[in-house]
Structure formats: structure tokens, C-alpha cells
Amino acid sequence: MGFAFDSRFDEISGGDITLKIREKAEGSRVQLPYYYYDILAEGVPVGRISIRTGDNFHTYYNGHIGYEVNEEARGHSYARRACELVLDAARFHGMTRLYITCAEDNAPSYRTIERLGGRLLEICEVPREYFAWYEGIPRHRIYQLDL
């Protein structure tokens, strides 16, 4: 039997933003099961967010949450607010802490993580064994968010 997704998390709303499920995947040996959403602000797409459940070696560098906000929609805290909305899904799946990561020099992203309450664990080189490693991959900021 595969990973048990919960349809209650297919659409999550809070304030003027809504997350609508784009894809669900059971994951693999390397990639964890995830929910992947479009972020909508008053019905207009402004970005995407994913929440990955479980843990493995790669999670530490990839993080449990990944987000991107369209360039023209930046500066409205959509990433932070979307992150807050997916936390219940993480809790539902038994998560008690999340890793959230970003490139060392990605100031908008690390400010988002810090505003969420993420605690910086380290800034590190990413090992070659990480599934998404590539030549020149930037150093990563690794944060932990306790749920």
C-alpha cells in the first residue's frame, strides 16, 4: 500500500490566499511523498509551494517545504503565508519538525524562513551524494522549524 494522502489538504485557504493542489506524488527511494500546490491570491496565481513528508538523507538539504513566488507578485509575504497554510498537513502526517533550506545568498527566502520561526542550524556545502547536487551548487542555509 502506498502513501495515504488526505483530500482535506487538496485546497487550503487563509486570508486572501488559497492553495490548490497541482500534484500529489508518493515519492521514491530518494524523493519523499509530497503535496504540490498553486498559490492563488484572490484567485490569481502568484506562485507554487510543496510540502514533503517523512525524512531521509536528502531532506536535510532539500527541505520539507519548497516555494517560489512569481517575480511580479513578490513583496506581499505570499511565501510565508503559504508556508503557514501547509503546516497542518505536515502535522497530520506526524511531522514534529521541518527542515527548510535555501541558497546561502537568497535573502528573501531566508527572511521568509526566519519570519516563520525557523532556527538556523548551519550554512554548509551540499554533498555530492545529494540527489540534486550539481557543479557550482551554492552553499545552503539549513533551518529547523519545530511544529
Q: What is the meaning of each model-derived region?
A:
Residues 105-122:
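Conserved active-site alpha-helix within GNAT-family acetyltransferase domains
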Residues 2-60:
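Acetyl-CoA-dependent GNAT
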Residues 91-101:
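Conserved GNAT acetyl-CoA-binding A-motif
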Residues 38, 50, 64, 68, ...:
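Conserved beta-strand segments that form the floor/walls of ligand-binding pockets within enzyme
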Residues 55-65, 74, 93-94:
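A conserved beta-turn-beta hairpin within the catalytic core of GNAT-like acetyltransferases
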Residues 101, 119-135:
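Conserved catalytic-core motifs of GNAT/GCN5-like acyltransferases
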Residues 34-36, 137-142:
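Short hydrophobic/aromatic beta-strand or adjacent loop that forms the aromatic wall/cage
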Residues 67-69, 75-88, 111-115:
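Conserved acetyl-CoA-binding loop-helix of GNAT-fold acetyltransferases
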